[in-house]
Amino acid sequence: MEIIIEAIQIAEAFNIKKFRAEFDNEAFSGSTSEVFYALNDSNRYLYVFDYGVVVFGNYDSIAKSKFIDYIKNYATTTVDLNLFEEYRIKLDKSISKVLVKDDYVTVPHIEAAIVGIVMLNIIQSVALEYYEVLTGELISSSKHYIVELEKKGKLSISKTNLLKYIGKVLNVKNSIVDNLYILDDPNLVWDNEELNLLNRRLKLNFDINPRFKDLDYRLQIVENNLTLFTDVLNVRESTRLEWVIIILIVLEIIIALFLH
């Protein structure tokens, strides 16, 4: 037996509360930020998180397409970055402990809780990839100005565009901070050694914690660039203000001399 797991970043966020109220299936587990369904009649599984990721278990292409169209009704802003990850759960009753590999995990038995843990880790991986893309774009967009500063000793960016850039950086950072819980271990692993072991090994396999640390480091680089750009812009604005004051003083002197 094999379960194919597919995770897709569909939107920046979902309205989970509204979705749960209107989706005609009973949840296996969930909270205000996530919901997991074990659809036993069709041997399918579904996991939806409020930060825009959906994970399918044993869904064919038609069923996936229909659900994606449906879930978009609960999305704030859709994402078109082709962020997708596939993983497999294989059953082998002859083993006693889970065996985690790069693209599949082998388990001694299959139950909804095990599938949920696998789905959760894939969700975390895709969500991290989304934020990696966003921070990569921020670093790339700031690189142009850093090169310009190195070669010309000045920045051509306007105050308005800098403020837009600052807003974009803060928006990404706030989104990451709001969704820090994606790294939290689910409650059901606390009292279940088998699930805890599976969760820990999957986190290692997907490099969840190292990737988050790298993400935090890259955000720090962006923030340092912001500080530099702001300082340069403040100096430029200060110099411009000084020239305005000097010109006004000169005009005042000329007018005074003319009147006398």
Where do the protein language model's features map onto the residues?
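Membrane-associated alpha-helical segments
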Residues: 152-254, 259
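Hydrophobic side chains in well-ordered alpha-helices
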Residues: 19, 66-67, 127, 131-134, ...
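Short, flexible segments with low predicted structural confidence
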Residues: 102-103, 147-148, 193-194
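Short Lys/Arg-enriched alpha/beta "domain-start" segment
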Residues: 1-111, 117
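Membrane-proximal low-complexity regions enriched in glycine and acidic/polar residues
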Residues: 113-178
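Phosphate-binding glycine-rich loops and adjacent basic patches that engage nucleotide phosphates
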Residues: 27-34, 89-101, 125-141, 163, ...
